[in-house]
Amino acid sequence: MNIEELNGKKLTDVKLTDGSLEFICDDGSIFLMYHDQNCCESVYIDEITPEWREILIGQTVTYAYESMNQDLGPKSGWESSYTWTFYRISTTAGQVVIRWYGTSNGYYSERVSFIQTAKPQDENRPLIGQKREIDGHIYRLS
């Protein structure tokens, strides 16, 4: 899966945590951008457009894409393998650039993952927070 899945989605929230970004859409779908850390590499968000919340939240994504660059060079001289990964997300309010930096000894992945963690709500599926009876018990869906 790639970040182009966000094209046309309206973002109701974006959560930045230590090492990941979660994109929550108005149709119930949720996407996660992260790196699954191993032992011998370091991959992290190096920089993000300062006004990212204002540009993304409540807006529809008009264009989202990923690009990589190794021509920028390593952040310090000792890295034998490094990757700069850029994610650009545009809305009518502007563009956000998320710059990830990864370094390793060359044997470990420096890639950023983008996955869907929740699918859009549909008519046949109860919305989160609604009650449903299963085997005689009432459950609140979360």
Q: PLM features: residue spans?
A:
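Short, low-complexity, charged amphipathic interaction modules
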Residues: 126-142
